[in-house]
């Protein structure tokens, strides 16, 4: 297809230039002495436990956009512990409705959902920054599910407007939620700043006294309504059982010592103490000052005789931190040390975990950091110390010990040249020694295995592959209880996962050319530039909250037609390689041609990136990839500029083919599984030490796929003949694997994976798994059925559109599915530059065009009966309202019905914003078909459902692909 270039061009090797990427395997890792960088040390004392792993720093603000956005695999993998979202009918943002997404959130690792109650208001600051008066009359005397409930007319009724807003919000949540006890209500957001009660830290100000009075009335009203539902006075789906509603506050934009002191004293006297104490730590300075703020707060509790209250930093970090694992680990370690919850700030759009995922279903490096952090659930944290404690942009870490699985983990990153933040390329090639003490031989035995994985920064929308093993130590003596593990950091913005286990019955190796997993990396500003392309030096400190981090603190711009970036690279082995470019643009898809040693080698197709505000243009970076066939030795890879005028940050060259001709082979050992419901790592069976024993539970793996299609999944395990386990992919049972022999063996099956992150689950009883290996098997893609949307039966408002500037296959696609919004052109002022903004009525409700619903029908017999992974290539540029800094995007809904438009719904999904209607992404759904016709559209009644997808508007469609979830039989092999 025209949008996806899979051609491979054979290139003959030239002279050599070695680009180092990782550390050596052996009994002791050695730092790269050529770097000339001073070694930094992170001290980890496993003998000093600091408490249960809290896991609260994986919170987000508006990290979820709607039910299904993000997809389950992304959400479950990230283990988002808490999230703050908007209230039902809230108009501050058009998506992120708590009720719409609660079931998905709580079924994928979520524990606590908070409601920003003031986000009921459409404007920022709320109500123009002024405390509301009594200027509206709200409709409250009808059932909560009546469409008129909560609407208003101008003119007062003797009741404070916000009191009525509170009643609306709490009633809508408690009447409809299925998880009332897991909600927290936040009545005020940044009251000390521009929202109604601004007085800085002046606790004597009259307006602050007004705030205290309003806090009391809000708190008591929330509790009153809670009791009405708990006692059954008001009808609800599920009755609350907790003694009282969880309320959080005060919600200041920074830590305020005087206001916090006065607030605690007052709230204690009035019995209105919050269940969660909330403030924000947004600036980079917070990496230095948070611990002192936290200590000051706890001293206030002691001063007033208050038992410790949970703390949630409901907004943390800047754009320079989001998607950057070496930054995120610094925040997470700080919050985990103090056992508090914390939520990444909401700087861009809802539904992408605060820029910590890529595309529609892929990981960026921020996602892998969230995933690693979430993997620590159930463990005990231990003491970690750094020479740079309370220093912004420095080496920090988290360490934990899982005694059940005999696994010790250290997450670390942020190493920086003598903390000199203005130095170009600071942080690259710094050797970091993790000094481990207190390793208990009673737990680990006399020798251990160690693996270190590297998670390198790829930009907010750049795809990050499964982190590679860059250091491995096998059968290392720990008789002294001490071990030093030194790894050279490729990038100060990378993070690292170090795992220690008892010596295992498997062969450890680093991901290098011998393993078919080599990776070569270069900053584009270090390549040879010509044709007007220029290097732009960046400072990691940036110029405020809206600064995006740049790999290597520099990038290349002015990259236009005639420009070339030339990279001389030494390829370690013959084979296929994936050339990835981290790049930003102006909000439209485009292409860059690639040549190798002067020969045309293909084209990289870049998708559009976020560009609706000046801070994001060219700087909100994604990635594009092309496959190259290269010979061992030196080559010159050239990227050619075009009219796209994109910026370039980093080049990466991934080895795709291994010596056995397997493609994109990734081995996931058992210590990388997430083990649940009784499954655990065991070390007491000879020949199976370090295997995951299922024990009636399950082993869960989050596997990366560069593209949708068939992948072989090979499971190596021990079992007795006849023992079985069930393999599920993305929540769908695929097959039962039954052992055909006794002892060590493997079973392999070809399954359909989606582009991005896939959740693989193995459940069973008497089976112990050593590892799971995935490999691309494109030959089986011939089993898929691909249907161009414009070739199908269109009805209603659905129509074909031609657009030569799009990245749709054949440059044509279908628009008009479902209903359609009434839209108007918008310029940069409304952050709708190059997009169309949905028109709102006086109640800030989107206007829906009076037109026939559009549908696309796949004729009967086209798709046989069966279970399929349905890949949808779509675009969505829906944009509702204006905001000072948040692009007001929404997800759109697509449903599939069996037989006719009135038939049974067999699939449903939320489809994210794609930056432009001409920019198409992939998202997959599982569908079970009967062989009848399939009708695609959006039949939701506008405004009736909870979330934005319920407005009845569908995305644009390029094509749909139906992959049978499994092809062929299970292939077994005895390894005994």
Curated annotation (Swiss-Prot):
pH effects? Optimum pH is 6.5.
- Cite the GO molecular-function annotations of the record: hydrolase activity, acting on glycosyl bonds
Write out the catalysed reaction: Hydrolysis of beta-L-Arap-(1->3)-L-Araf disaccharides from non-reducing terminals in branches of type II arabinogalactan attached to proteins
Q: Where is this site: Important for substrate specificity?
A: 116
CC per GO annotation: extracellular region
Catalytic residues in the record:
190 (proton donor), 315 (nucleophile)
Taxonomically, the superkingdom here is: Bacteria
Record keywords, A-Z = Carbohydrate metabolism, Glycosidase, Hydrolase, Secreted, Signal
Where in the sequence is the signal peptide annotated?
Answer: 1-28
Temperature section of the record: Optimum temperature is 35-45 degrees Celsius.
Domain (CBM6) ranges = 519-654
| Compartments it resides in | Secreted
The enzyme's E.C. designation: 3.2.1.223
Task: Respond yes or no to whether keyword Hydrolase is given for this record.
Answer: yes
Q: What is its main location?
A: secreted
**What is known about what this protein does?**
Hydrolase involved in the degradation of the gum arabic arabinogalactan protein (AGP) and larch AGP. Catalyzes the release of 3-O-beta-L-arabinopyranosyl-L-arabinose (beta-L-Arap-(1->3)-L-Ara) from gum arabic AGP and larch AGP. Also cleaves a small amount of beta-L-Arap-(1->3)-L-Ara from sugar beet arabinan, but wheat AGP cannot be used as a substrate. Can also release 3-O-alpha-D-galactopyranosyl-L-arabinose (alpha-D-Galp-(1->3)-L-Ara) from gum arabic AGP, with low efficiency.
Family designation: Belongs to the glycosyl hydrolase 39 family.
> What name goes with this protein?
3-O-beta-L-arabinopyranosyl-alpha-L-arabinofuranosidase
Q: What is the lineage of its organism?
A: Bacteria, Bacillati, Actinomycetota, Actinomycetes, Bifidobacteriales
């Amino acid at each position: 297809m025209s949008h996806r270039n899979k051609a491979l061009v054979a290139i003959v090797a030239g002279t050599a230039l070695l680009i180092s990427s990782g550390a050596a395997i052996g009994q002791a890792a050695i730092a790269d002495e050529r770097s000339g960088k001073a070694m930094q040390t992170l001290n980890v004392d496993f003998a000093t436990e600091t408490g249960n792993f809290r896991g609260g720093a994986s919170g987000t603000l508006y990290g979820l956009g709607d039910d299904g956005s993000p997809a389950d695999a992304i959400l479950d993998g990230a283990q988002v512990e808490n999230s703050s979202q908007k209230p039902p009918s809230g108009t501050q943002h058009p998506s992120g409705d708590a009720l719409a997404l609660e079931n998905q959130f709580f079924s994928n690792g979520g524990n606590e959902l908070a409601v920003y109650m003031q986000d009921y208001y459409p404007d920022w600051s709320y109500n123009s920054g002024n405390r509301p008066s009594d200027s509206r009359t709200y409709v409250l005397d009808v059932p909560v599910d009546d469409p008129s409930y909560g609407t208003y007319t101008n003119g007062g009724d003797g009741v404070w407007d916000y009191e009525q807003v509170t009643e609306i919000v709490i009633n809508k949540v408690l009447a409809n939620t299925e998880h009332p006890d897991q909600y927290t209500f936040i009545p005020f957001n940044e009251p000390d700043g521009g929202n109604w009660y601004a007085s800085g830290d002046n606790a004597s100000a009259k307006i602050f006294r007004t705030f205290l009075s309003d806090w009391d009335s809000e708190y008591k009203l929330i509790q009153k309504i809670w009791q009405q539902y708990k006692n059954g006075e008001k009808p609800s789906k599920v009755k609350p059982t907790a003694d009282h509603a969880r309320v959080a506050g005060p919600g200041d934009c920074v830590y305020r010592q005087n206001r916090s002191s006065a607030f605690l004293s007052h709230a204690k006297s009035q019995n209105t103490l919050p269940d969660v104490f909330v403030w924000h730590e947004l600036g980079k300075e917070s990496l230095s000052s948070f611990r002192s703020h936290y200590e000051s707060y706890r001293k206030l509790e002691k001063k007033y005789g208050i038992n410790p209250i949970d703390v949630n930093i409901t907004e943390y970090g800047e754009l320079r931190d989001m998607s950057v694992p070496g930054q995120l680990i610094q925040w997470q370690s700080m919050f985990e040390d103090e056992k508090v919850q914390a939520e990444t700030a909401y700087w861009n759009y809802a539904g992408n975990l605060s820029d910590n995922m890529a595309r529609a279903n892929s990981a960026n490096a921020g996602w892998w950091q969230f995933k690693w952090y979430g993997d620590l659930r159930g463990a005990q944290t231990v003491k970690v110390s750094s020479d740079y404690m309370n220093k912004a942009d420095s080496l920090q870490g988290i360490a934990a010990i899982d005694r059940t699985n005999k696994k010790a983990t250290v997450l670390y990153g942020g190493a920086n040249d003598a903390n000199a933040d203005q130095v170009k390329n600071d942080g690259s090639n710094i050797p970091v020694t993790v000094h481990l003490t207190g390793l208990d031989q009673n737990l680990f035995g006399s020798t251990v295995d160690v693996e270190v994985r590297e998670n390198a920064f790829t930009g907010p929308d750049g795809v990050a592959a499964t982190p590679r093993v860059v250091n491995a130590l096998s059968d290392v003596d720990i008789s002294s209880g001490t071990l030093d593990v030194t790894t050279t950091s490729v990038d100060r913005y990378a993070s690292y996962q170090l795992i220690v286990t008892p010596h295992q019955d498997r062969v450890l190796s680093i991901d290098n050319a011998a393993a078919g997993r080599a990776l070569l990396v270069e900053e584009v500003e270090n390549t040879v530039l010509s044709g007007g392309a220029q290097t732009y030096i960046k400072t990691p400190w940036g110029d405020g909250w809206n600064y995006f981090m740049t790999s290597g603190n520099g990038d290349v711009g002015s990259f236009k037609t005639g420009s070339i970036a030339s990279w001389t690279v030494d390829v370690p082995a013959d084979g296929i390689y994936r050339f990835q470019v981290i790049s930003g643009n102006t909000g439209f898809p485009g292409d860059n041609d690639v040549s190798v040693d002067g020969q045309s080698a293909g084209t990289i197709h870049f998708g559009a990136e976020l560009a609706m505000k000046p801070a994001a243009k060219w700087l909100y970076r994604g990635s594009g990839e092309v496959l190259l066939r290269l010979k061992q030795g030196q080559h010159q890879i050239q990227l050619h500029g075009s009219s796209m005028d994109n910026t370039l940050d980093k080049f990466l060259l991934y080895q795709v083919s291994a010596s056995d001709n397997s493609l994109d082979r990734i081995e996931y050992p058992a210590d990388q599984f997430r083990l649940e419901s009784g499954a655990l790592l065991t070390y007491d069976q000879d020949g199976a030490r370090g295997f995951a024993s299922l024990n009636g539970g399950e082993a869960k793996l989050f596997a990366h796929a560069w593209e949708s299609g068939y992948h072989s999944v090979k499971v190596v395990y021990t079992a007795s003949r006849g023992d079985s386990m069930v393999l599920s992919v993305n929540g769908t049972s695929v097959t039962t694997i039954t052992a055909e022999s006794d002892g060590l063996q493997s079973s392999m099956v070809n399954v359909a994976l989606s582009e991005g992150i896939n959740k693989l689950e193995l459940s069973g009883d008497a089976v112990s798994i050593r590892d799971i290996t995935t490999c691309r098997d494109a030959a089986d893609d011939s089993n898929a059925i691909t249907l161009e949307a414009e070739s199908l039966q269109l009805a209603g408002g659905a129509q074909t559109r031609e657009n030569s500037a799009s990245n749709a296959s054949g440059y044509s696609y279908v628009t008009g599915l479902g209903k359609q919004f009434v839209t108007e052109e918008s310029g940069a002022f409304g952050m709708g530059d190059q997009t169309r903004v949905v028109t709102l009525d006086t109640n800030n409700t989107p206007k829906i065009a009076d037109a026939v619903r559009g549908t696309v029908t796949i004729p009967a017999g086209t798709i046989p009966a069966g279970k399929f992974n349905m890949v949808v290539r779509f675009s969505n540029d829906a944009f509702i309202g204006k905001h000072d800094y948040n692009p007001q995007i929404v997800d759109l809904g697509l449903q599939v019905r069996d037989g006719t438009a009135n038939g049974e719904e067999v699939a449903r999904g939320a489809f994210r914003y794609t930056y432009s209607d001409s920019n198409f992404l992939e998202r997959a759904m599982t569908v079970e078909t009967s062989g009848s016709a399939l009708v695609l559209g959006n039949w939701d009644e506008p405004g009736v459902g909870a979330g934005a997808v319920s407005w009845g508007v569908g995305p644009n469609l390029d094509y749909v692909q139906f992959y049978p979830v499994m092809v062929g039989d299970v292939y077994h092999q005895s390894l005994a």
